[in-house]
């Protein structure tokens, strides 16, 4: 059975969805994972997709190292 969203639940979702794991929010609000995802879509909020400078550096290094290793493997 569906239950209506309270203003407080919506506020919690809006303030936390971008950075907090969806499962954690679902548990905190006693709602399903899909309920949280669907409400976020309807509210027009999304997860933070901006990489930090450290993540960018790590990604560049990881891709470089992986490519270098793969080039040394036979038949790959």
Swiss-Prot record:
Domain of life of the source: Bacteria
Family per similarity comment: To L.innocua lin1255, lin1742 and lin2600.
Protein's recorded name: Uncharacterized protein Lin2408
Native species: Listeria innocua serovar 6a (strain ATCC BAA-680 / CLIP 11262)
């Amino acid at each position: 059975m569906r239950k209506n969203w309270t203003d407080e639940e919506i506020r919690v979702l809006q303030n936390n969805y971008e950075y907090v794991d969806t499962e954690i929010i679902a548990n905190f609000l006693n709602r399903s994972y899909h309920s949280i995802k669907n409400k976020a879509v309807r509210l027009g909020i999304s997860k933070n997709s901006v990489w930090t400078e450290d993540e960018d550096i790590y990604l560049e290094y990881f891709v470089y190292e992986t490519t270098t290793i793969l080039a040394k493997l036979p038949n790959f």
